[in-house]
Amino acid sequence: MAAATSATAIVNGFTSPFLSGGKKSSQSLLFVNSKVGAGVSTTSRKLVVVAAAAAPKKSWIPAVKGGGNFLDPEWLDGSLPGDFGFDPLGLGKDPAFLKWYREAELIHGRWAMLAVLGIFVGQAWTGIPWFEAGADPGAVAPFSFGTLLGTQLLLMGWVESKRWVDFFDPDSQSVEWATPWSRTAENFSNSTGEQGYPGGKFFDPLSLAGTISNGVYNPDTDKLERLKLAEIKHARLAMLAMLIFYFEAGQGKTPLGALGL
């Protein structure tokens, strides 16, 4: 008796404006037909799988559709955390520039979050407005000018230069020659595989976006995506808050003073 087995798979993508809110949305149709023959007996089985439609892009102006690239730029596909299609000046048309601006937004947003916290805590602790914190020449500084210069110029400059190099050449700074004072360069490697989110034991010591098992960091994709969205939202709020703080400082006011505290 002869036995024969044949299997064919046809993947057909199609779009549905109704399902995607007027935007192209891909679906997959998988058709499998298998036959197993033994003598005169034949078994035929068909399987059809239809994938769910992709979620429509979010707009920075709710309930507004269309409007061309001003309201819905084609170069923003919603894949970036916090992407609501806001790019009226077209700064992200070039993918290379888009990658650079996202990195810049992350870095400036993280500094802004630290600054906002420092402004509130510093004034609440000492009573000195943040824009007058270094105005008293007779105050006893916790460190010398040389220490400040060395910290800013050498240490922070060195770290920032390595981050800049790693942006253009990912993972180039996680090798032994780049971290000679570390026993394992892997501690400084990108554990998530995404630019701007290194993760790992040193950059995620509390395991907020992953777990550490037998000394190895394992990222949790779901947690990481939620935290990336939360971070970029708080970062943007902090940058706006700093802009307001600058306007207040120009009038001699402080954030706590504006709140009546």
Curated annotation (Swiss-Prot):
Subcellular location, principal: plastid
Pfam families assigned: Chloroa_b-bind
Membrane topology according to the record: Multi-pass membrane protein
Keywords: Chlorophyll, Chloroplast, Chromophore, Membrane, Photosynthesis, Photosystem II, Plastid, Thylakoid, Transit peptide, Transmembrane, Transmembrane helix
KW Transcription (keyword) present: no
Residues passing through the membrane, by range: 111-131, 139-159
SUPFAM superfamilies: Chlorophyll a-b binding protein
Molecular function terms, GO-annotated: chlorophyll binding
Transit peptide as recorded in UniProt: 1-51
Signal sequence annotation: none
GO CC terms in record: chloroplast thylakoid membrane; photosystem II
GO annotation (BP), single: photosynthesis, light harvesting in photosystem I
Subcellular location: Plastid, Chloroplast thylakoid membrane
Record-stated family: Belongs to the ELIP/psbS family.
Entries under PANTHER family matching the protein: CHLOROPHYLL A/B BINDING PROTEIN (PTHR21649)
Name of the protein: Chlorophyll a-b binding protein CP24, chloroplastic
Species of provenance: Spinacia oleracea (Spinach)
Higher taxonomy: Eukaryota, Viridiplantae, Streptophyta, Embryophyta, Tracheophyta
